[in-house]
């Protein structure tokens, strides 16, 4: 596969935001991971990250084979997923666009990263490994992410029902951010994307 990382670069605002969130060490890991993804996939930037939860692998059954795959744990700061149903795998897909913007159909392709597993805070490694993939994806150009999880706490719901999250409180006492003690999470959840998912 050719080395197609020449176009890989973060704009000043993205670099500043990533640096503010990750600190110097996390920024270095994120950039290194983004370069690894670009080298392994031959794609300098990706558009979307999808992180699958337990039992969600079948959600992509209708997608074609990925253009490239690598182990999540090969990326700096990312650990081998240990939760049941999670895999140590990151896939790169090319997906045709077919959405409307300003009333007109937009063509082209999406470059999509799909993580088939993740690290959870309850595993005891602290927040760094939990957010490492998200930071790497941001450094790789990703501007939107879809996080999928199993909600076993909702006993009245059926398997496969979809719920979108619009806000949350961090009650863990743990934070991956360098900076303010309280981070307002309302802007994290995208209302337009939630609408597209059918909430």
Feature locations, PLM:
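Metabolite-binding pocket within alpha/beta catalytic cores that recognizes anionic/polar moieties
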Residues: 2-185
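Active-site rim beta-loop-alpha module in soluble metabolic enzymes
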Residues: 187-199
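Accessible peptide chain termini
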Residues: 1-2, 199
């Amino acid at each position: 596969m050719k080395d197609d990382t020449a176009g890989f670069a973060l704009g000043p605002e993205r670099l500043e935001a990533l640096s503010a969130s990750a600190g110097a060490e996390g920024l270095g890991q994120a950039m290194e991971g983004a370069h690894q993804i670009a080298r392994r996939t031959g794609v300098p930037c990706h558009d979307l990250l999808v992180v699958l939860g337990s039992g969600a692998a079948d959600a992509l059954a209708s997608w074609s084979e990925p253009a490239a795959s690598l182990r999540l744990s090969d990326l700096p700061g990312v650990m081998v997923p240990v939760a049941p149903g999670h895999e140590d795998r990151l896939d790169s897909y090319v997906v045709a666009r077919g959405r409307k913007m300003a009333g007109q159909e937009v063509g082209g392709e999406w470059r999509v990263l799909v993580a088939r597993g993740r690290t959870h805070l309850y595993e005891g490694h602290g927040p760094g490994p939990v957010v490492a993939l998200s930071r790497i994806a941001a450094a790789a150009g990703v501007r939107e992410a879809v996080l999928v999880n199993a909600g076993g706490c909702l006993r009245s719901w059926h398997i496969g029902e979809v719920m979108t999250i619009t806000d949350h409180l961090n009650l863990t006492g743990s934070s991956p951010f360098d900076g303010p003690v309280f981070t307002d999470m309302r802007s994290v959840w995208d209302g337009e994307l939630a609408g597209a998912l059918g909430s």
